[in-house]
Amino acid sequence: MNEYEKMCAYFKIMYANIFSLHHNLIGGNWHSDHKQLGKYYEMIGIYLDELIECGLSLGYKEPSISDAVLTFSNEVLPCMNREKGESFGYILEAFRSAAGMLKAAEAVVPPDVQNKLQEIEYELNLEADYKIVRLLNATAPTAPTYDYDDDD
């Protein structure tokens, strides 16, 4: 399996995992978090479709579910109830991993496809490093505070 096919296999695993997280979310802001997880699996599904169709047009083989599970067996999440933090924490790491695989796949595709991979990489990094981090409040920086002396 080349880097492009491996990336597609990872997207299949990520899609199935996010679908499971969507179904098994519990606690907190359930309604809005459930809705956001749904948006993520729809987004990954659209990307997966585009990536596979593009790969087929380049002569690459679509990895089967079996291929994907064999390649990424340690990434398959069991279906079980999960809180918001665990669910979105997984997505944060999965998006970052997917962005790295998109970058690696650029080496085996023509320039126009490289551009598409970079667009998806940008979107995943934006979601992970800005939106999800803020959602989790994990590493969002706080604004610096300044003491002003009004007597000057």
Language model region names:
Residues 25, 51, 55-58, 62, ...:
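Leucine-rich amphipathic alpha-helices with coiled-coil/heptad-repeat character
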Residues 142-152:
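Short acidic DE-rich linear segments
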Residues 14-39, 101-114:
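Helix-loop segments that flank and shape redox-cofactor active sites
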